[in-house]
Swiss-Prot record:
SUPFAM superfamilies: Nucleic acid-binding proteins (SSF50249), S-adenosyl-L-methionine-dependent methyltransferases (SSF53335)
Domain of life: Bacteria
PANTHER family linked: RNA M5U METHYLTRANSFERASE, TRNA (URACIL(54)-C(5))-METHYLTRANSFERASE
Positions of [4Fe-4S] cluster binding: C72, C82, C85, C160
Active-site residues per Swiss-Prot or TrEMBL entry: C340
Record's protein name: Uncharacterized RNA methyltransferase NE1857
E.C. number(s) listed in UniProt: 2.1.1.-
Pfam families with a match to the protein in the record: tRNA_U5-meth_tr
Length: 393
């Protein structure tokens, strides 16, 4: 069953949204952009309790003025295509505008008045191609590539334009091993994965071994490090700084430059903590901790209750729970928050503000051009005597 319509906006996941002219339901459509007019086929019937469904574009009648031909020949939106860079169909200025819209929508949805938010332009990536310093491919011994969206199908990839030169060379080195019996998956598995970055050798090949987390865009990572350095300089010195989700020390290195005598850095990954400890950063005490443990703030309270500054860079889940957080960090005055998800950032920011905190700086950064991803940096300050009861969840 098909219908015609126009893409009006993008969903929080970066899919085009079109309204059915007859039933009034909204449908999410991959590979479309606001202003596209086309013919769509419903692929997922909306349930009675839902006001949306999924559809696919079967014919483009009129292109959005922002639409362009993607540079990558592997990009597509079927079950046999790579859709890792779904926004490559649009010009870059429009991509940045939509990323900002994603953030503003998330903030508005939790309760923020957008008129009170002073959000500037998104910090663009200096490079639109050749920027990515790490990648993960899947292989079954016959094919090597990325997995098609919503499937268990490996899309063979001969080249990837967003990888930096070293990673592109790694990809070619891996392809020379095909076919490989050693890369065949174990019974019951669909594939093995190979995780590489531009600082690791492509050979010998290590199957199913994950590299420690690393920001994927060096230039934008340097921008964020500079932001953190400036933020820490502006907000005075503290006798103790706590960092949560420190990884292998990307931002810990910046914190150590402040000269703070006591820096507690927490991370769940023991491998990352080992790497951080080997750096021997001055004043840094690196510790493993399950930061998503239901009683984590009670566990950490004794060690963090006198900290004046908190730096955190959580995964997409954000902090998950703030129950007991404000009690544990009783002396905290400044929070420097680096986030990779606007929805969980908005959730956490709303709870901060309802408990007497105020953000004084928010910046949006584009780490991954051609994707819906947006990075957020923000500084929060404690408004002493302005804490509202009943929001400590």
């Amino acid at each position: 069953m098909s219908f015609q319509g126009e893409i009006t906006h993008l969903s929080q996941k970066g899919l085009g949204v079109v309204q059915h002219p007859e039933n009034g339901l909204s449908y999410f459509v991959a590979g479309t952009w606001p202003g596209d007019r086309g013919e769509f086929e419903i692929t997922d019937r909306a349930l009675n309790n839902r006001k949306y469904g999924y559809a696919r574009l079967i014919r483009l009648i009129q292109s959005s003025r922002h639409r362009k031909t993607p540079e990558c020949r592997f990009l597509g939106f079927s079950g046999n295509d790579c859709s890792g860079c779904p926004w490559m169909i649009a010009d870059y200025d429009s991509q940045l505008e939509q990323k900002k819209n994603r953030f503003l929508y998330a903030m508005h949805r939790v309760g923020f008045d957008l008129a009170d938010l002073n959000i500037g332009a998104v910090q663009p990536s200096p490079d639109l191609f050749g920027y990515r310093n790490r990648f993960q491919v899947k292989t079954d011994g016959e094919k090597l590539g990325f997995v098609a969206e919503g499937s268990h199908h490996i899309v063979p990839i001969e080249d990837c334009l967003i990888l930096n030169p070293a990673c592109r060379q790694h990809l070619q080195t891996l392809r020379k091993h095909l076919p490989s019996r050693e890369w065949s998956p174990a019974p019951g598995d669909d594939w093995n994965f190979i995780d590489l970055d531009d600082q690791s050798p492509a050979e010998p090949v290590l199957l199913n071994w994950k590299q420690p987390f690393r920001q994927g865009n060096d230039a934008q990572n340097q921008w964020m490090r500079s932001w953190l350095k400036y933020a820490l300089e502006q907000h005075g010195h503290s006798h103790k700084i706590v960092e949560l989700f420190c990884g292998s020390g990307n931002f810990t290195e910046v914190i150590a430059q402040t000269g703070c005598p006591e820096i507690l850095a927490y991370e769940a990954d023991p491998q990352a903590i080992t790497v951080l400890r080997q750096k021997n950063l001055p004043g840094v005490d690196a510790r493993t901790a399950d930061l998503y443990h239901p009683f984590i703030w009670k566990i950490l309270k004794k060690n963090v209750q006198d900290a004046g500054i908190l730096v955190l860079d959580p995964p997409r889940s954000g902090l998950k729970t703030l129950r007991g957080f404000f009690d544990a960090f009783a002396a905290l005055e400044t929070i420097c928050y680096i986030s990779c998800d606007p929805v969980t950032f908005a959730r956490d920011a709303w709870i901060f503000c309802k408990n007497g905190w105020k953000f004084t700086d928010i910046q949006l950064i584009d780490l991954f051009p051609h994707t819906p991803h947006i990075e957020i940096t923000a500084t929060f300050h404690k408004q002493w005597g302005n804490t509202k009861k009943g929001n400590k969840r």
